Curated annotation (Swiss-Prot):
GO CC terms in record: extracellular region
GO biological process: neuropeptide signaling pathway
Annotated Basic and acidic residues bias: 227-240
UniProt name for this protein: Myomodulin neuropeptides 2
Keywords for this protein: Amidation, Cleavage on pair of basic residues, Neuropeptide, Pyrrolidone carboxylic acid, Secreted, Signal
Source species, domain of life: Eukaryota
Annotated spans, Disordered: 23-44, 212-240
Biased composition (Polar residues): 26-41
Compartments where found: Secreted
Length: 240
């Protein structure tokens, strides 16, 4: 579509230029130049200038003025790099700008939207009991709830450890023999907290049947295949 418009505009420019070329010899062919001829040339020059500006605005995809403005002789605002457009109709005043910013920043939140869960850095074990007692105390059912609530508030509060990324890793180095009063205590402690895979034995090959497990069938260790197998040798002998 834009290519068609550009080609049409080029044809129009060529036609206007050819008309000007024909009009200039006719205007200067006489011995005297009249005011009518000069005014006609000036009008044609202004029309060419407006046509060039209109073509430029068409290439940019924007139209700064209407056809009535072009016919009446008003200048079409052109896009200049590094300068502001003289047309201030698209600008917002202070009140309109404030209204737009307030509409963007104070946008009402969708209550049905799922909120991201916050990290729980420990939770009081007695928090649920305190909430329940607060609800009962607000109803005013009995005065014993106040005594229980005061005992909970005065008592110590225990918090769960917050989950962390490396909770399954040892954050402290293994204790050495120097950290224990005696070598015997160190050996007892190390055996008690030994890892399960530290005393794992290597699987042995099953040669024959085990004495402790008679349900297992006899299974021999596979022999290394050196050369041809016996079945192939038998087939070769039978073929001979």
């Amino acid at each position: 579509m834009w290519k068609i418009l550009e080609t049409c505009s080029c044809f129009l420019v060529v036609a206007v230029l050819s008309g000007l070329g024909k009009a200039q010899p006719e205007s200067f062919s006489g011995s005297a130049v009249t005011d009518d001829s000069t005014s006609g040339a000036n009008k044609r020059g202004w029309s060419m200038l407006r046509l060039g500006r209109g073509l430029q605005m068409l290439r940019l995809g924007k139209r700064g003025g209407s056809l009535d403005a072009l016919r009446s002789g008003h200048q079409v605002p052109m896009l200049r790099a590094g300068r502001g457009s003289p047309d201030t109709s698209g600008r917002l005043d202070a009140n309109e700008l404030y209204a737009v910013l307030s509409a963007i920043l104070d946008e009402p939140r969708d209550q049905s939207r799922r909120q991201p869960p916050l990290p729980r850095y420990g939770r009081d074990n007695n928090g649920v009991a305190r909430d329940l007692l607060d609800a009962l105390a607000s109803d005013g059912e009995s005065s014993s709830n106040f005594d229980l609530l005061s005992s909970l508030n005065n008592g110590p509060s225990y918090f769960r450890p917050a989950p962390r990324g490396g909770r399954y890793k040892r954050s402290l180095p293994d204790a050495g023999p120097a950290d224990y009063p005696s070598l015997e205590d160190y050996l007892v402690q190390s055996r008690q907290f030994a890892r399960p895979y530290s005393s794992r034995a290597v699987a042995l090959p099953r040669i024959g049947r085990f004495s402790g497990s008679p349900r297992l069938q006899a299974k021999a260790v596979p022999r290394p295949r050196i050369g041809r197998q016996e079945s192939q040798m038998r087939e070769a002998k039978s073929a001979e």
